[in-house]
Amino acid sequence: IVASLASYGFARYSGKLRSLVFFSYVILMLMPYQVTLVPNYLVAEKLNILNTYWAIWLPGIFSPFAVYLLTKFMKRIPVGVMEAAQIDGAGEWQIYRLICMPLCKGALCSAAILVFIDYWNMVEQPLILLSDAEMHPLSVFLSKINSGEIGLAFAVATIYMVPSLLAVSYTHLR
């Protein structure tokens, strides 16, 4: 939802500042996570969310990839539809909520799935931001399994795929 709000602003308005901020989103999207690891750690420390699930969830909520994907989708919504809504008396919030969001449902589902899978597969972030091993996701446990424990590795890998498959199945039904 946060990404859709930012995307609406990027898609609907133009200007030098908008272009600069959107370009910074694209640069952040292209950077590997390891480059932003120290700043993310410092922000999590400042917000006092180290060793909590929020340290993992917040970067996903503000994902630059989701903003980029949704912005590109929202730019394809005909301007005439939004202008017609304005003529009918709709404000910005109503245009966003009643026109853009229903039209972007497929893009929202795609962005949610891709961001979820991206953060579900992370290993470095939980290792750095979560000191309690019980809070680590399966991706960390899967990376620690030795090659001699092949049966355990396949069992964990099968369990590891279930949340992603459920997320795809759930959004496919929508």
Regions picked out by a protein language model, each given a short descriptive name:
Residues 1-174:
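A structural signal for multi-pass alpha-helical bundles of membrane permease subunits
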